[in-house]
């Protein structure tokens, strides 16, 4: 039974009754409940009727052909027929042929929502009905089904200029994304009744061939025309980039416009625009470039957050040409605008002075971003002021200053850090020692040794990290001594640092001793350190911590055993799979993925199919590490797991797995509409055998899958994938050639134009010839 959150107790009771009626196959009683006042209950009734299949079809048809007094029951009956598991198409065709307008419209709607390809001829006939409502319903149904007949019908409707058919057909034609849509839509741009809708539809085509038409609108005196043209240009860019991965088509096409006049018109049109329109205008200004565009973009930084972010991104894309205006704005702006400007300031030293001025901004976020920007620039003249910020009251600023100083390096940095570590208070010594620890110079050793005697735990922590970075016997001796310190925090830091040292016998012996330390964090870091330098002899004492009182120690022990490997470690990992502690089980699964022993593979089954989603997720990740034939099948099954996280992981892991089996599995998963986008994204991961596997699939797949696979190859942006597209244009499968044609752009594949010209002249399929011709005209 469909479980719905938010039901009242009475609604849950009625939904349960509907499920009971389904179990009894009580079709008539369920049909009677289509008028239930609760949408949630009707949803349960619709679900039950759809699962009854063929036996519910005629009773539902009777609801639609009866007295039709209840709009509620009519809508519910349509939903039930749309989702029915039965053979609905013939009954829906009878409805569509009805002389009753409302019944005919319901029939067309059902056929469209079920994507009944076999009904296209009848729907095409209805699209020419004398009744505008019937014709519109048929057109919408054809739009849901798609295909070449849909494009032809929409073009015919648009060119009819019959308002009640042409107007809705404009949107439907644009949504086909077909290159042939551009010309008829362009013919409407000067028609007062259709122009604005045609501009929107041109955007929805996602066709670069429409860009010159829209670019002309950017200089019109009407601000509304300019705004809608900008929105449509952005939509073309996003759709084309999303489909084929090519991001230069629209910006390249806009290079021929008069940048100054277009920028002025866009800036003026932005004044009364809404947030989405201003955001689009910002992006178009970024593509156009030039001083007027940059000036307008700086002004848009003060708009709503969405627009400001878009303007900042456009300024960042203009890089060096925008720098003078950016720096001028940085000098004169308040904190809010500086938050947008600082991340996009370039790496040239000419920006140093203006960025340094931001270190005095009252907003700590601005000061932190200024530190980050100075680190990117790398101008050593900023070192003195960055050292002043080490004592900033806000920790983010202090840490940002440390990171910037570390990025610069040099003798001046080391000199200042040494001086501060010697003379500063505890608050100043910590960042100074952290800087010195980053460079790990042996000349800093006395300061680190002195720091280990500091009464402040935090200073000792930083000093211990510095000792770990210095390759000197005195540093190692100090760390060994610190592992006996009275402070558990200092012992833990020292033990962690010992894990970064050479695997000498004194170090290994001391780490083994600290496995028995009374503090859990000391034991934890000891286990981690031994996993790196302990060797197989450490396996047994580490295995003794599998039942430690502290959960994080148990998990660390599992991870360490996996890294140490060996028969004893593997046996301990197998044993840990039976633990009552879910964290230990997950750690053991991760460990088995590290070891990758074929003998462990069958043991993953219970975790892969268990009740706990988090454990299944870890099991799927471990599974992918094994090199056995069954891995691909198990990952494909996990792609239908109830947990969205597990499904996503399984698909992504298939995407990164080389070989034809993984590619075939992913292509098979494209049939699942819910995960289709994620599967397509996974297929774009370039691994051995991926391109070859996609081409093999293109030779046999239908139109929908072929279009997706062509987009995958185009988005790879690799020479092998480009050659594969060109090869696919010669495949016998006409669906592959139809899908490839829109991708044959010089932006995507070098020989694109030549192949389009060849296809327009000699392809055996008329639709391919027309597609190629339309693209070439664009």
Located regions from the model:
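Structural signature of alpha-solenoid helical repeat scaffolds
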Residues: 37, 68-69, 99, 130, ...
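Structural detector for internal amphipathic alpha-helices that build alpha-solenoid repeat scaffolds
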Residues: 3-24, 32, 40-54, 62, ...
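Short acidic active-site motifs
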Residues: 29
């Amino acid at each position: 039974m469909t479980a719905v959150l938010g039901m009242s107790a009475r609604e849950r009771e009625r939904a349960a009754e509907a499920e009971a009626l389904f179990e009894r196959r009580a079709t008539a009683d369920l049909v009677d409940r289509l008028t239930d006042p609760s949408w949630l209950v009707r949803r349960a009734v619709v679900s039950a009727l759809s699962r009854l299949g063929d036996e519910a079809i005629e009773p539902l048809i009777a609801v639609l052909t009866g007295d039709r007094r209840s709009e509620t029951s009519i809508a519910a009956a349509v939903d039930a027929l749309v989702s029915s598991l039965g053979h609905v198409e013939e009954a829906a065709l009878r409805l569509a042929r009805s002389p009753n307008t409302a019944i005919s419209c319901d029939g067309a709607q059902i056929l469209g929502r079920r994507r009944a390809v076999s009904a296209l001829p009848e729907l095409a006939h209805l699209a020419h009905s004398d009744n505008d409502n019937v014709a519109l319903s048929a057109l919408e149904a054809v739009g849901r089904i798609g295909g070449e007949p849909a494009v032809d019908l929409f073009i015919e409707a648009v060119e009819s200029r019959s308002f009640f058919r042409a107007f809705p057909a404009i949107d439907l034609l644009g949504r086909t994304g077909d290159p042939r849509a551009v010309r008829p839509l362009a013919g409407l741009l000067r028609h007062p009744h259709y122009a604005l809708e045609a501009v929107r539809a041109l955007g929805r085509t996602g066709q670069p061939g429409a860009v010159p038409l829209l670019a002309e609108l950017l200089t019109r005196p009407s601000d509304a025309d300019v705004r809608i043209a900008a929105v449509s240009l952005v939509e073309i860019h996003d759709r084309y980039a999303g489909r084929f991965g090519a991001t230069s088509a629209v910006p390249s096409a806009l290079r021929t416009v008069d940048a100054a006049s277009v920028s002025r018109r866009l800036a003026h049109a932005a004044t009364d625009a809404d947030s989405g329109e201003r955001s689009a205008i910002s992006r178009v200004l970024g593509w156009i470039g030039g001083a007027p565009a940059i000036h307008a973009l700086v002004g848009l930084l003060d708009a709503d957050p969405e627009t400001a972010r878009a303007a900042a991104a456009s300024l960042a894309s203009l890089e060096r040409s925008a720098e003078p205006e950016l720096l001028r704005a940085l000098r004169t702006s308040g904190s809010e605008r500086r938050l947008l400007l600082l991340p996009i300031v370039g790496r040239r030293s000419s920006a140093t002075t203006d960025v340094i001025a931001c270190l005095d901004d009252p907003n700590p976020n601005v000061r932190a971003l200024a530190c980050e920007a100075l680190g990117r620039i790398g101008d050593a003249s900023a070192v003195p002021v960055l050292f002043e910020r080490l004592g900033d009251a806000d920790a983010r600023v202090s840490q940002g200053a440390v990171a910037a100083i570390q990025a610069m390096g040099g003798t001046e940095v080391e000199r200042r850090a040494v001086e501060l570590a010697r003379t500063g208070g505890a608050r100043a010594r910590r960042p100074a020692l952290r800087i010195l620890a980053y460079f790990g110079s042996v000349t800093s050793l006395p300061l680190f040794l002195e720091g280990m005697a500091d009464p402040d735990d935090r200073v000792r922590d930083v000093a211990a990290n510095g000792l770990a970075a210095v390759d000197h016997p005195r540093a190692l001796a100090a760390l060994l001594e610190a592992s006996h310190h009275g402070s558990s925090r200092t012992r833990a830091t020292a033990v962690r640092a010992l894990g970064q040292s050479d695997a000498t016998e004194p170090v290994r012996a001391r780490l083994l001793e600290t496995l028995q330390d009374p503090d859990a964090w000391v034991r934890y870091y000891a286990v981690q350190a031994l996993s790196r330098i302990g060797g197989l002899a450490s396996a047994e004492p580490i295995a003794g911590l599998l039942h430690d009182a502290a959960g994080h120690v148990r998990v660390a022990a599992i991870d360490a055993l996996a890294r140490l490997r060996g028969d004893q470690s593997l046996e301990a990992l197998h044993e840990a799979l039976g633990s009552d502690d879910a964290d230990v089980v997950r750690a053991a699964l991760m460990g088995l993925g590290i070891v990758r022993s074929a003998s462990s593979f069958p043991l993953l089954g219970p975790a892969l199919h268990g009740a706990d989603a988090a454990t299944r997720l870890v099991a799927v990740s471990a599974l992918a590490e094994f090199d056995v034939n069954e891995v691909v099948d198990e990952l494909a099954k996990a792609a239908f797991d109830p947990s969205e996280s597990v499904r996503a992981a399984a698909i992504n892991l298939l995407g990164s797995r080389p070989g034809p089996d993984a590619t075939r599995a992913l292509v098979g998963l494209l049939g699942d509409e819910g995960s289709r986008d994620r599967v397509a994204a996974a297929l774009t991961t370039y691994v051995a055998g991926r391109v070859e596997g996609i081409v093999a699939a293109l030779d046999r797949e239908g139109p929908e899958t072929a279009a997706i696979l062509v987009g995958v190859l185009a988005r790879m942006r690799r020479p092998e994938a480009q050659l594969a597209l060109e090869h696919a244009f010669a495949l016998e499968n006409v669906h592959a050639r139809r899908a490839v044609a829109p991708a044959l752009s010089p932006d995507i594949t070098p020989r694109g134009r030549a192949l389009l010209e060849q296809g327009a002249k000699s392809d055996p399929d008329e639709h391919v010839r027309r597609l190629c011709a339309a693209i070439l005209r664009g």
